[in-house]
């Protein structure tokens, strides 16, 4: 009952907040608008990553002689998103829907969008259209497809979009889009972070945790994308999750280079532990004291993981050294450490 009550309290808090922020859009540069949504109902992103500050699902509109909508949002926000798009369009009709990534939190509303704007042309690569046909069996895109190859361009007027394929960052069909006019990179899931946009928090921590959980296994693919990005004059990064990045872009690019090449970000050490009766905790505390006395530049971080496996693996990812103190149940690791032990297989 307590869990049910907590859910409904959170739900109604969300509904009140949603009403207050209804049709809240944001202009980026001269002709680009943010039309994304905040999700404060989600507790576990993708069913496993704790997101205490929710998530954002980002979408954008480019208004030029031709109008392009960049990606859709999660299925739980159809009406809110379509309302924001309509507000920005202000009676105009979109010419293109650009689909960079087919994961449902970004692609769920393709069919709903096409019902609202049936004359729109969908812009995507071949793999994306194959996925689309399987996702939306009843959707007819005959005569409404614009298939792009890597490096192809699309002219909207003064805005020229260049499509750069980024397979396995983190799905096989992913591509990013560069607007050479406003020098904006629409980066798909790259440079995303956990957290809704109406909550202010440090980028590095939640972006690192997002990267490890969602993209971390695909370091070589991210490195390839970074090399392509290095040839572009990028002044703004518009990801599909998290804030729009407009300042100090070198910092974000450097972080992605470190994470994707698995370099050491900090010389500290983390000791993660779980403890039933307190004995493992005491051992972990003693180990941390000993490690701290060794003159480590960044000291020692002690973390009780409990049920939040993403916190444990996220905490040790940037460090040179990590220790684990765990207890066993019937000769097996408890689930949180079984997860952390397998993390190298992912990253």
List the model feature ranges, each with a label.
Residues 70-72, 94-102, 122-125, 185-188, ...:
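Active-site neighborhood of phospho(di)ester-bond hydrolases with catalytic His/Asp-centered motifs
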Residues 76-123:
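Active-site metal-binding motif and surrounding structural segment of the metallo-beta-lactamase
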Residues 285-300:
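Short helix-loop-beta junction
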Residues 304-347:
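Helix-loop-strand module that forms the ligand-binding subsite of alpha/beta enzymes
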């Amino acid at each position: 009952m307590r869990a049910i009550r907590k859910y409904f309290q959170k739900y109604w808090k969300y509904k009140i907040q949603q009403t207050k922020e209804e049709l809240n859009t944001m202009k980026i540069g001269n002709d680009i608008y943010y039309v994304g949504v905040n999700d404060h109902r989600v507790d576990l992103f993708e069913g496993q990553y704790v997101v205490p500050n929710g998530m954002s699902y980002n979408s954008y509109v480019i208004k030029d002689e031709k109008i392009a909508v960049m990606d859709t949002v999660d299925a739980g926000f159809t009406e809110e998103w379509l309302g924001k798009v309509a507000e920005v369009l202000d009676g105009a009709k979109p010419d293109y829907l650009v689909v960079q990534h087919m994961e449902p939190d970004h692609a769920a509303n393709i069919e709903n969008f096409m019902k609202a704007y049936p004359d729109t042309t969908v812009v995507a690569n071949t793999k994306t259209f194959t996925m689309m046909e399987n996702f939306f069996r009843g959707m007819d895109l005959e005569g409404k497809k614009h298939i792009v190859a890597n490096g192809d361009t699309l002219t909207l007027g003064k805005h020229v979009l260049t499509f750069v394929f980024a397979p396995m960052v983190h799905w096989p069909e992913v591509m990013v889009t560069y607007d050479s006019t406003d020098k904006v990179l629409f980066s798909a899931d790259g440079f995303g972070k956990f957290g809704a946009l109406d909550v202010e928090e440090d980028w590095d921590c939640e972006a690192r945790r997002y990267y490890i959980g969602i993209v971390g296994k695909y370091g070589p693919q991210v490195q390839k994308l970074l090399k392509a990005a290095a040839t572009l004059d990028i002044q703004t990064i518009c990801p599909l999750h998290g804030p729009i990045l407009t300042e100090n872009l070198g910092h974000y690019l450097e972080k992605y280079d470190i994470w994707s090449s698995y370099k050491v970000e900090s010389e500290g050490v983390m000791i993660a532990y779980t403890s039933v009766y307190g004995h493992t905790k005491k051992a972990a505390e003693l180990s941390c004291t000993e490690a701290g006395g060794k003159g480590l530049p960044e000291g020692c971080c002690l973390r009780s993981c409990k049920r939040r496996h993403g916190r444990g693996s996220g905490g040790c990812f940037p460090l040179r050294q990590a220790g684990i103190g765990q207890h066993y149940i019937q000769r097996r690791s408890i689930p949180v450490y079984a997860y952390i032990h397998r993390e190298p297989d992912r990253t």
